[in-house]
């Protein structure tokens, strides 16, 4: 099997355009129209590349409610004016993170020069029971659902196990994640929950699944996101594009059921995906300037700090309390607001993370712009950890020198 480093030795791939819809509730939109808007915005940011330049597309969606599951990929690309071969990727919440990975593979291997990758989801028109069902199928459907377990309940088990294993951790640490991400989301014009919350707001909110409260859980969301992945030759031929190099991509799978895995206080697939991405990029956690991580529930962000190597096991609460992951900290995490405040349109989430990385690395983040970041990391998880993908982007276009850390 080709190693991550050998894969990195193939031709380079670049993200040269990225766009997304607002995330929220849009009863007058369809999954087709949302994705078309994201494609329009990605192409508008791509410095002269147009629909005629796209060789193929890879898209991700869960298909909440069962809408157009069989051919939703071609349905959205044809509606968006892209008559190209289209593949739909399914990996629960990691669907479009994997779509981006597949696009990178196609470009790096030489199978394509320009690939559009993205995702979409419409969730807010579904009833609560329908949403619970479709989130539940991201877990182990025969046994976890048989016991009445919900998606929130599964992560609550992880949260309780973390509190029991690491005595210094408290429920207030979950609330600190919410406070940070709501503050970031309040400044993001695309975010669903554009308001701040206090520690008391988060800790005293209604319990969803003990010990998780409402503010420890992401919302249900409609939205779409898309990015253009191109070869180094295409990037060099279009000097007006703002390019970020795909330095590394790592992916891993695991047993789908939480009860089938050896630990409740880590997501091994995230750890393995990160190791592969770091190896391919020839970099380390210390080189990462900012990250977008999969905070579907507050406990998931704390686990991500540890799974991605930002700190040792059990030290995530300390990292958070010390402000390291704040917007003005040493390692800002979820400056977009994360899934918690930006929103979690399942199939669009992974691509949306790449949109944020591209904006920050190319200076397109507006008032939210970080101070000269060079390396960004996106972390996207499917279910409770049955799949994970980690993508590392670096500042700099084809032929440009990317400064070292």
Language model features: what each stretch is:
Residues 32-48, 72, 99, 155-159, ...:
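Short, well-ordered amphipathic alpha-helical segments that serve as non-catalytic structural scaffolds
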Residues 27-100, 106-107, 111-132, 285-307, ...:
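Conserved beta-ketoacyl condensing-enzyme motif
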Residues 64-71, 258-262, 295-317, 345, ...:
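Short glycine/threonine-rich loop-to-helix capping motif typified by GTGT followed
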Residues 63-114, 122-154, 193-219, 252-254, ...:
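Conserved catalytic cysteine-centered active-site region
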Residues 4-32, 141, 165, 176, ...:
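Condensing-enzyme catalytic core mediating Claisen C-C bond formation in acyl metabolism
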Residues 90-121, 153-188, 227-233, 342-365:
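Active-site-proximal alpha-helical scaffold in enzymes
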Residues 262-299:
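Long, well-ordered mid-to-C-terminal structural blocks that present hydrophobic/aromatic surfaces
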